[in-house]
């Protein structure tokens, strides 16, 4: 199995050009009454444009902290995070986040939630064009018939579809997913995984996704970033996932290599980097 050690040098994607996204020697330290607390220590990661990256690790290992720095919600204590060569120091419409708890406005309809994002990012766009973008993205996630329903009237799976439509409607370069399917039942989760892959294949934006589900990561990702435990967490290994695209779930699960990869990731999490209480 092909894995990359975390401390490998950062290699440009082509001569004279940085990779699309670079996390370089990033540490995050919080001041507490008991002294400095290091969440992340010297993290290095490069991501190419259009890649689908999953990040996995135990709770408290800094997965969300890392993605918050890519989204611009937080800044490194040391090191840098760069998108297309430019330092990330604040949130921006080139990076959109989908959260596990949806983060939708419940008094609005599905249509209005998506429209709000399009209107905020493109205030000068013609009204007809905005409405067409909203309709297009709701249709993309199968919610044309539910467009006028309020968020309180739809299921959890439908809410997450609205959140994905909203994020993609402003055409971000990076889609950041923080355990987007963690609260859903198994059937809905698999349906949304399939839809996400189809949408990603059509849009080809770069995706960074936190998950606790190894099977989900092996089905979705090009590479799986495996974090060590915190405090002072780091990237332990990066697993390259070899299955060709487009991916078929049944075919992948019949491949003996799938179980080798799955067992390797499980061993990393529960033997080599098991929690102290496990």
UniProtKB/Swiss-Prot annotation:
InterPro entries assigned to the protein according to its UniProt record, in alphabetical order: AAA+_ATPase (IPR003593), ABC_transporter-like_ATP-bd (IPR003439), ABC_transporter-like_CS (IPR017871), ABC_transporter_ATP-bind (IPR050166), NO3_transporter_ATP-bd-like (IPR005890), P-loop_NTPase (IPR027417)
Topological category with respect to the lipid bilayer: Peripheral membrane protein
Molecular function via GO: ATP binding; ATP hydrolysis activity; nitrate transmembrane transporter activity
Gene Ontology CC: one annotated term: plasma membrane
Segments passing through the bilayer: none
Ranges where the ABC transporter domain occurs: 21-254
Induction behaviour: By carbon dioxide-limited conditions, probably via CmpR.
SMART domains: AAA
Any GO BP: monoatomic ion transport
Quaternary structure note: The complex is composed of two ATP-binding proteins (CmpC and CmpD), a transmembrane protein (CmpB) and a solute-binding protein (CmpA).
Role this protein plays: Part of the ABC transporter complex CmpABCD involved in bicarbonate transport. Responsible for energy coupling to the transport system.
Name of the protein described by the UniProt record: Bicarbonate transport ATP-binding protein CmpD
Gene: cmpD
């Amino acid at each position: 199995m092909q894995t990359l050690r975390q401390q490998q040098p950062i290699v440009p994607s082509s001569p004279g050009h940085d990779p699309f996204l670079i996390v370089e020697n990033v540490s995050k330290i919080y001041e507490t009454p008991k002294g400095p607390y290091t969440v992340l220590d010297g993290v290095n990661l490069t991501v190419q444009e259009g890649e689908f990256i999953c990040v996995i690790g135990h709770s408290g290992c800094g997965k969300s902290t890392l993605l918050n720095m890519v989204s611009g919600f937080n800044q490194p204590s040391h090191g840098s995070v760069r998108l297309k060569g430019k330092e990330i120091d604040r949130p921006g419409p080139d990076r959109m986040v989908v959260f596990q708890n949806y983060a939708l406005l419940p008094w609005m309809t599905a249509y209005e939630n998506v429209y709000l994002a399009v209107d905020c990012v493109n205030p000068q766009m013609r009204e007809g064009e905005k409405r067409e973008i909203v309709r297009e993205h709701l249709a993309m996630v199968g919610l044309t018939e539910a467009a006028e329903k309020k968020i309180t009237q739809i299921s959890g799976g439908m809410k997450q579809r609205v959140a994905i439509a909203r994020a993609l409607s402003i055409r971000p370069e990076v889609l950041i997913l923080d355990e987007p399917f963690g609260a859903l039942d198994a059937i809905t989760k698999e349906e949304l995984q399939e839809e996400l892959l189809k949408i990603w294949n059509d849009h080809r934006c770069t995706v960074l996704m936190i998950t606790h589900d190894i099977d989900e990561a092996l089905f979705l990702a090009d590479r799986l970033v495996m974090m060590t435990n915190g405090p002072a967490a780091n990237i332990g290994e990066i697993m390259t996932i070899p299955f060709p695209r487009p991916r078929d779930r049944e075919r992948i699960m019949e491949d003996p290599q799938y179980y080798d990869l799955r067992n390797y990731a499980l061993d990393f999490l529960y033997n080599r980097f098991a929690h102290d209480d496990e």
